[in-house]
UniProtKB/Swiss-Prot annotation:
GO terms for biological process: D-glucuronate catabolic process. Keywords: Iron, Lyase, Manganese. It comes from Yersinia pestis bv. Antiqua (strain Antiqua). This is Mannonate dehydratase. Catalyzes the dehydration of D-mannonate.
Length: 397
């Protein structure tokens, strides 16, 4: 696997020197300063590449080229935004980058309710609390029809949770959910968020699939022409939230995506932490089934709690993800590719990480502190090395 590291650009508290010292050789980044829907100029892409090259690093994967909401809703100026997206892909390929990660989650990117969940050892993790989220939907956002998405017991628990909240608690929870986490290009106020939600009235899973299919039929031919591998990131969490459909959550969704535009350039980001939240997602089976379409991997683990929809981020070798078996399946796919002459390793980044040691006293992007990811990268690197020497001696070390 190619060891990569996500970097949020010049304002990221984690520097390029830090990344190099972590042992990563590739960087996963994006032009976050360019608004959604605007074409990325070649000059801007090359400028970012030059910044990385100055530190002996390469831009391995673009994560992400955000998809404008008009495309997802198939409304407004969607056709122009698709044309802009196509041109951005051409410009990325012109600069020699061949992998683009993206997602098709409506409105929100990845979602958490607690960004500082304290673990028994004193480190901090990200957490999604189903009851806290219900309290937000039912009593803060007051989304019409939200009660249909929760059991009677969850509604009682959510009301008790809300009644115990202070104004500061309400503001913090609201900000955690809708203000935008790292990688999300847009944040909202409550009123703005309600307006956005209303734009999805009448858009169910079938309609969102149709909208995504229209997008894929427009951009995958461009990816084929310029040699780009598109890698869709799964929903996080992998289920409908806020009354919004989610369509990249299960192996059935992966099969639908493959069949919709059957091209090797229409591929996946295997995010084990996103898919792994669902106990019914067999990660190894996903890799074995769609191995040739997996163009990028995010390796992390989560821990499901008493309510099966509540989870927190676990250590990379702990929690509900069998990282040993996952890495072995990825290396098996790499071996298959190399036997066919494709020598490029699959890019991997250690996804998220606990806030720990002196990072507890620093400004960090939630989930993206340096030391927690350094620990995760070292652990995954160790698993990979042991597997290679035991089962895959012919793979490049």
């Amino acid at each position: 696997m190619e060891q990569t590291w996500r970097w949020y650009g010049p304002n990221d508290p984690v520097s390029l020197d830090d990344i190099r010292q972590a042992g990563a050789t590739g960087v996963v980044t994006a032009l976050h300063h360019i608004p959604n829907g605007v074409v990325w100029p070649v000059s801007e892409i090359k400028q970012r590449q030059a910044e990385l090259a100055a530190k002996n690093l390469v831009w391995s994967v673009v994560e992400s080229v955000p998809i404008h909401e008009d495309i997802k809703t198939h409304s407004g100026n969607y056709q122009q935004y698709i044309e802009n997206y196509q041109q951005t892909l051409r410009n990325i390929a012109e600069c020699g980058i061949d992998t683009v990660c993206y997602n098709f989650m409506p409105i929100l990117d990845w979602t958490r309710t607690d960004l500082e969940y304290e673990l028994p050892d004193g480190s901090k993790a990200l957490r999604f609390d189903q009851i806290a989220f219900a309290a937000f939907e039912l009593h803060i956002l007051k989304r019409p029809g939200a009660s249909n998405d929760y059991t009677a017991e969850e509604q009682v628990q959510a009301e008790a949770y809300f009644n115990a909240m202070t104004e500061a608690d309400i503001a913090k929870l609201t900000g955690n959910i809708i203000a935008g986490l790292p990688g999300a290009e847009e944040g909202y106020t409550l009123d703005q968020f309600r307006v956005r939600l209303a734009e999805y009235d009448g858009i169910d899973k079938a309609q969102l699939r149709e909208n995504m299919a229209y997008f894929l039929r427009a951009i995958i031919p461009v990816a084929e022409q310029v040699g780009l591998r598109m890698a869709v990131h799964p929903d996080d969490p992998p289920r409908p939230i806020l009354g919004l459909p989610r369509i990249v959550s299960t192996i059935e969704d992966m099969q639908w995506l493959k069949e919709t535009v059957d091209s090797i350039h229409n591929g996946f980001t295997m995010c084990t932490g996103s898919y792994g939240v669902r106990a019914d997602n067999d990660l190894v089976k996903m890799i074995e089934t769609f191995g040739d379409r997996i163009h990028f991997t995010h390796l992390r683990s989560t821990c499901r709690e008493g309510n099966p929809k509540t989870f927190h981020e676990g250590g990379h070798l702990q929690g509900d993800v069998d990282m040993y078996s996952v890495v072995k399946a990825i290396l098996t796919e790499e071996q298959r590719r190399q036997s066919l002459g494709d020598m490029r390793p699959i890019p991997m980044r250690p996804d998220h990480g606990h806030q720990m040691l002196d990072d507890l006293h620093k400004k960090t992007n939630p989930g993206y502190s340096a030391i927690g990811r350094l620990k995760g990268l070292a652990e995954v690197r160790g698993v990979e090395l042991a597997l290679k020497r035991t089962f895959f001696p012919e793979l490049k070390q």
